[in-house]
Amino acid sequence: MWGDRRISELVEPVVAALGYELVGVERLSSVGKGALLRIYIDTPSGITIDDCERASHQISALLDVEELMASAYTLEISSPGLNRPLFTEEHFKRFTGVEASITLSKPLNGRREFKGLLRGIRGDRVVILVAGEEFELPLEGIKKARLVPEC
């Protein structure tokens, strides 16, 4: 899982105890506004505002006790939504056959952006079919990945 691994490892048991799946964690910073910590949760039947509020109270208390955030931050609990972020190898396996957009940290063959059909996992690489050409992208090199909603 990329994103913030330390925070993910800390909040996953809390999220699971509430009956949710931790989809992933994103830590975003904005100059002058502090950090935004976005935590995605889900269940097979989806997530409601009440679910997000319930998780927010538990996670906020935990983060304050553990003092993982060095400065002021805003905590946002969210469902993954239609353009679901993909964080783990399991996510790429689960959504094989679905269109996704992947951004790499470093270019591969001169490009960082790939949008196409997920073909699964080979070893430690995500396989994606882009305009008839298959690419194998290193899992550890993925900066951001999301499903592309169907129109």
Swiss-Prot record:
Gene3D superfamilies: Ribosome maturation factor RimP, C-terminal domain, RimP-like superfamily, N-terminal. One of its GO terms (cellular component) is cytosol. SUPFAM superfamilies: YhbC-like, C-terminal domain, YhbC-like, N-terminal domain. Keywords: Cytoplasm, Ribosome biogenesis. It is found in: Cytoplasm. Transmembrane segments: none annotated. GO terms for biological process: ribosomal small subunit assembly; translation. InterPro entries: Ribosome_maturation_RimP (IPR003728), RimP_C (IPR028998), RimP_C_sf (IPR036847), RimP_N (IPR028989), RimP_N_sf (IPR035956). It holds the Pfam family DUF150_C. It comes from the Bacteria. Belongs to the RimP family. Required for maturation of 30S ribosomal subunits. This is Ribosome maturation factor RimP. The gene is rimP.
